[in-house]
């Protein structure tokens, strides 16, 4: 897989961060973007658990990363909120250590379809199913478990919902993507979707193109998919390729904005580096969900959660 196709989720290029500024293990978080002191689910019947799935450093290979604190600021703001008289908890689920079985996928000259074995996305999906079963066995009803995901985590979440909707209350996905910066690199705005995808297939090979198409078609076969999807036309990944989600009955799609503002407010990423707060303007729409401005959509998210957990 070429470097320019690496799906980077929470890489902060401009700074070097202490390990304490990263979230590298599974667990519940609090409003301060730290791991909660209590990692148990007390009174599980009156809790709503949001399982948050990060993006990926690479499409099919393993990584030691998970996410950065600045990336969960908006998710952390939901912790403790009451919906239908039930309290929200947010669980960070780190699965980037998983690897697909056929890593030749992005090596055009070496890969011979079909994909042999289980992809990283499928392994992440299966890991989520195991985690869901764990929480259910502890007493949390299936409908009170919501899957959340960004980028590759969001793409995987849509796959999960299309197959196992009965196991969860719903899905909230932001910038679902996992096949590189197709919108930007293949000039979707200039060429149009069809020609851009032809260029993508020609350059990267049938392996990635076929797998992407297969996964989209599977998701689109859903008769009803009551999920909440956030996209942005300036997202260099799937930004101008996301209209297909509206073909699925039940999908609630939110186009975040047409620029790098939300409701007229400029978006800033606010994080912690070596114990000190920092901020910078959001420059890439793929990461606008990390901006402080994204909390404008908290009422929409809470309304969706309420509709799926009543």
Regions found by a protein language model. Give the residues of each.
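Alpha/beta-hydrolase active-site loop
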Residues: 104-139
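Primarily recognizes the serine-hydrolase "nucleophile elbow" in alpha/beta-hydrolase
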Residues: 143-190
């Amino acid at each position: 897989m070429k470097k320019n196709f690496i799906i980077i989720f929470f890489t902060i290029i401009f700074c070097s961060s202490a390990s304490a500024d990263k979230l590298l293990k599974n667990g519940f978080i609090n409003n301060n973007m730290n791991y909660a002191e209590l990692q148990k689910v007390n009174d599980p019947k009156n809790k709503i658990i949001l399982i948050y799935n990060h993006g990926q450093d690479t499409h099919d290979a393993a990584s030691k990363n998970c996410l950065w604190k600045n990336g969960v600021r908006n998710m952390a703001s939901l912790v403790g909120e009451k919906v239908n008289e039930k309290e929200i908890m947010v669980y960070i689920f780190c699965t980037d250590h998983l690897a697909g079985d056929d890593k030749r996928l992005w090596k055009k000259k070496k890969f011979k379809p079909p994909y042999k074995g289980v992809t990283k996305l499928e392994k992440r999906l299966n890991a989520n199913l195991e985690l869901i079963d764990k929480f259910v066995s502890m007493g949390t009803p299936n409908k009170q478990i919501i899957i959340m995901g960004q980028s590759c985590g969001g793409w995987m979440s849509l796959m999960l919902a299309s197959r196992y909707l009965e196991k969860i209350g719903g899905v909230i996905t932001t910038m679902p993507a996992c096949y590189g910066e197709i919108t930007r690199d293949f000039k979707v705005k200039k060429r149009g979707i069809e020609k851009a995808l032809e260029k993508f297939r020609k350059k990267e090979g049938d392996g990635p193109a076929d797998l992407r198409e297969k996964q989209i078609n599977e998701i689109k076969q859903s008769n009803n998919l009551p999920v909440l999807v956030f996209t942005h036309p300036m997202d260099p990944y799937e930004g101008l390729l996301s209209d297909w989600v509206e073909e699925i009955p039940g999908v609630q799609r939110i186009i975040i904005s047409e620029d790098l503002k939300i409701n007229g407010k400029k978006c800033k990423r606010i994080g912690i580096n070596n114990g000190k707060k920092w901020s910078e303007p959001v420059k890439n729409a793929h990461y606008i969900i990390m901006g402080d401005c994204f909390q404008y959509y908290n009422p929409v998210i809470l309304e969706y959660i309420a509709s799926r957990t009543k």
